[in-house]
Amino acid sequence: MKKLLSALVILVFATQISFAQDAPKTEFKFNGLYNVWGQMQNDFTMGKTQYRDAYYVQMLRLNFSFNYGDNIKAVTRFDLGQGWWGVDNETPTYAGASGMFDNKDTHYSLHVDHAYIWFNVPSISTAFNVGRFNWAAGNKMVLDNNYDGINAIIKVGEVDNIKIGAAKISEGVLSISDLPKVPPDSKGGYDARDANLFTAAYNTKFGTSNLELYGMYYYDGSIEDSTAYLIDGLYYNRPRFTPQVTSLGIFGAAGTTKMDKLTLTYEANYLIGKDEIDNPSYAGRLNTSPSKIDPLKYDINNGDISGYNIYLKLNYAVAEAVTLGMVAGMGSGDDDPTSGKGNVNKLRTAGFFYITEVWEDSIMPDEEGITPQGLGAPNVRAYRELENTTALQLNSTLSITPAWKLFGSFTYLKATQPVFAWTAAGPDLTTSATDLGWEVDLKTDYKIYSNLTFTFRAGYFSPGTASKYLINGSDKWELAPWELKTVITFAF
């Protein structure tokens, strides 16, 4: 008996040693980013109201990866000590994290952006992401946001892959119920059914080109209460006369091509969907303050919505230290906010599609928590990305030294469809314009160390009649918006 017990102990001990030797290697990896930027924003309402915003914002972002061998890992990303200087850290005081930004009191002590697992199954050449992570397409014109869901990346050949995914965009009225009627939330919504997104993409590489073909379908089942997650579930204001999106299909192609000294970046997409909520007026609850009414919130349409975006960026290396560039883009607009089809240019984005400093640069107050910038911010309510915008930009980048770069640009902006003057009663279809204006921008980066950069940015926007109508409803006010920005970035 003793010999048997001894043999069992030796066997168990040997097995444990064998398992310990065969166990996958566990690794902990991290990197991060610290940003502090000073903003000086002036005359964004063109003189209708006094507008002088000068403030500092900081963010410490950390990325962590817990790897268990080569085929499984847990990943998270969070932000620490984030907010406006001069505001102590405290818990949110508004309904929904994003609602804090327009009131300038965002001050998270900790905010989690990503939390997911990644695992690879070599036998089927497929990797999976499960949890909360970034969902994006192309150049981030139509989709760029963090959502909860699952996607699969299927390897095809040596370099190609197919991605398919499903994301939960909204758990209706912040309730786990899926009933069409529950007690209402702060915005009056009571339909607890959900909004979901389904995506697919094919990524390929050939020669010096990378190409992405993508498609997605979004469906919101929570519209019985005459509200839709897009746009009623957002905690920031969209431009006036925006349709509610109850379903949306998006199809597009995006890529890059390098030919000797010339680099091309391009994208084209088409959007088609429905606004099944029959609004009798433009009025709705103000997104940033649900107890108040936004008299010009909604587009009135026939239930159909559609749109498109076309984008081309060229950079040509004239010399080792000099690059000349051009950016051209066109996005669809609504030719009549009182009837007919509505216009849509995206699902949801965080504003990282960049053309200009003032007109379009509008990093939004989405859940990642980044201060709004540019005229596309929710307190000004101009366009973002290429919404009803036709843009042509000429630019140049000069490498003064290996550590110092200078960028300058001139951009002409025109509305794709006329922008109508408006009053609180609605749009004036007899008064419209297409001249949005022009902008001159400057940006310089200086590397103090290889991973520590100081940046200065400046933009001056000369408004046309159409941008005055868009923001103020009238061309009575004419001050030119301008902005100065300083940034210190430490990447580690």
Model-derived regions, located:
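Flexible glycine-rich, low-complexity coil/linker segments exposed to the extracellular/periplasmic environment
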Residues: S339-L386
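Solvent-exposed loop/turn segments connecting transmembrane beta-strands
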Residues: A136-Y147, V245, K274-E276
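Beta-barrel outer-membrane channel/assembly domains of diderm bacteria
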Residues: L5-G131, I150-I162, T204-K205, T246-S306, ...
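Acidic, metal/ion-coordinating pockets
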Residues: R132-F133, D148-I153, N161-K168, D178, ...
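Hard-cation-handling environments
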Residues: G325-D334
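Outer-membrane beta-barrel translocator/channel fold
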Residues: G165-G233, N237-T242, S247, L271-I300, ...
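The substrate-binding groove and active-site-proximal loops of carbohydrate-active enzymes
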Residues: F101-D105, R132-K140, D185-Y190, R240-F241, ...
